[in-house]
């Protein structure tokens, strides 16, 4: 089943503690693996938010697209070698406490990260100038 044929994910219900639900993402505490600190699992659902309101109809595949955009930016920022980030993995098999039955739902829409103190800064990127527009 691919993103075009899979049903939209409105909400998740994983066997992990401390589930919190944002407007479009579900967040869980991930139990520590041996020698590691607890982590955080961020799952991008297909919920749609506009003007701080969650719309009643999800968009199939939206969570996967959000995750793809996020990981692209993490890769770009990492290539500059200026600052670290929280991202550990985007693979469901790396999440302690889950079994293989949860993998299809999470594939392409999750990020496993280090638990960290939140710095309340938000960046919104809606587009950027390239090509001849940048030269001017």
Regions found by a protein language model. Give the residues of each.
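Active-site loop/lid in soluble adenylation, ligation, and acyl-transfer enzymes
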Residues: 2-136
């Amino acid at each position: 089943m691919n993103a075009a044929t899979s049903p939209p994910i409105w909400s998740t219900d994983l066997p992990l503690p401390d589930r919190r639900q944002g407007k479009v993402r579900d967040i869980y505490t991930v139990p520590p693996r041996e020698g590691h600190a607890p982590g955080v699992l961020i799952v991008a659902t297909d919920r749609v938010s506009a003007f701080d309101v969650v719309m009643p109809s999800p968009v199939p595949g939206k969570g996967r697209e959000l995750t793809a955009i996020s990981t692209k930016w993490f890769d770009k920022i990492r290539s500059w070698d200026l600052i670290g980030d929280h991202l550990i993995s985007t693979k469901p098999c790396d999440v302690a406490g889950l079994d293989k039955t949860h993998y299809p739902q999470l594939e392409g829409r999750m990020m496993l990260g280090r638990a960290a103190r939140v710095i309340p800064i938000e960046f919104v990127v809606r587009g950027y100038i390239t090509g001849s527009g940048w030269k001017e």
